[in-house]
Amino acid sequence: MKKVNHWINGKNVAVNDYFQTTNPATGEVLADVASGGEAEINQAVAAAKEAFPKWANLPMKERARLMRRLGDLIDQNVPEIAAMETADTGLPIHQTKNVLIPRASHNFEFFAEVCQQMNGKTYPVDDKMLNYTLVQPVGVCALVSPWNVPFMTATWKVAPCLALGNTAVLKMSELSPLTADRLGELALEAGIPAGVLNVVQGYGATAGDALVRHHDVRAVSFTGGTATGRNIMKNAGLKKYSMELGGKSPVLIFEDADIERALDAALFTIFSINGERCTAGSRIFIQQSIYPEFVKRFAERANRLRVGDPNDPNTQVGALISQQHWEKVSGYIRLGIEEGATLLAGGPDKPSDLPAHLKGGNFLRPTVLADVDNRMRVAQEEIFGPVACLLPFKDEAEGLRLANDVEYGLASYIWTQDVSKVLRLARGIEAGMVFVNTQNVRDLRQPFGGVKASGTGREGGEYSFEVFAEMKNVCISMGDHPIPKWGV
């Protein structure tokens, strides 16, 4: 049986307590995983603290070289890492191999460039004073990463953190530990010094809590549920925070939209990554005049999506991360039907046509709930699975009101050919990101983050400075500015 240990100060550290990680498609035990706690966190933070001064003072060009080297190693191992990710998460192999793992490599390439642009600004004052700013690393950072796209999200945090001169302790979700372990190994192979990146496995209540509370941790970058994020900010003390939390993102489709493209994007945005994505367009608002036809075609296509073995390159929807999560998502489907929604595709039960080796897997068919009322729980609460809620709206004003009538505010999607309408809605919609006539297309230069219960702070490009860098002001006198003469 494979054993996954911690990576602390460049060493593979075994412990006494282990838990098992399983393949969500088959139930097969994949590995015994080290269960870290306060002792391992203390060791990892101490190692990161000791490594920080030398790493922070390494020339930017050298840090950039090491970032590129790590990105190259990921590129060289895409098939292996993708297979590992698919086995551990149930994500379809065509998504991990062709999109998610290559994107992880690009994170390091991108931030290798960003770290060489850590330029401050100068502010001359009346020819008598000169102010200038220094952009400096924070110190030891806690990186707490989720299970839905674990390798990509881990690198999305590790790359800017390390490139900007910080050291880190990465705590991956206990549901998806395998690729984080590989990342720790590849970082050392790339030549990143011991202690700069430490990977501690374990549960949130033990390893995660000890990490974010640690007094030597200066910044916390967390991606996960809103309740956990609130708890971290309540208990972890005065630190820098980046919190990317839950979402219930609206899709507004107006009658003048390019319906074919809107249909393509709406299906992709909710059902890709098994629907387990924070930016999923889970509330799809369709203008009344096109509602019946759009709903009919959406449901027909959802019924045709291929659910099955994540290792099959033709599979579009794989297995949900765990049996517990399957029960949660299935329960929401039942709740939606009880609340009065119309079930047009999918349903709360496992597919009946699965092959024998997948019968015990956490599979759900892509589910379409139509005629949803925005006050229903299925429209207000994050389901985090392949469940689309379809709702009609009358006009622009009602569409905007319904889109904003939710506690979350991460992503949003607008479909219309009316530029004036786009400009009004983009300003009025309560979300950190607005995508117009497109699915979620990420550019690493753009800020990523949400408003309201979807979190605080931004990451991406120079916006990653918010959590991973400190701005220091230096004020220099030219020598003859007036100084009050007290006590003369």
What is each PLM-predicted segment?
Residues 227-373, 436, 483-484:
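ALDH superfamily catalytic-core signature
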Residues 24-89, 289:
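N-terminal alpha-helical segment of soluble enzymes
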Residues 46, 68-79, 93-118:
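Long amphipathic alpha-helix in the N-terminal Rossmann-like dinucleotide-binding domain
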Residues 26-32, 217, 252, 306, ...:
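Conserved C-terminal structural/oligomerization subdomain of aldehyde/semialdehyde dehydrogenase
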Residues 29-36, 50-57, 143, 251-254, ...:
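Short, well-ordered beta-strand elements within core beta-sheets of diverse protein domains
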Residues 167-169, 343, 433:
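A short hydrophobic/small-residue beta-strand
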Residues 120-261, 393:
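Rossmann-like NAD(P) dinucleotide-binding subdomain of oxidoreductase/dehydrogenase enzymes
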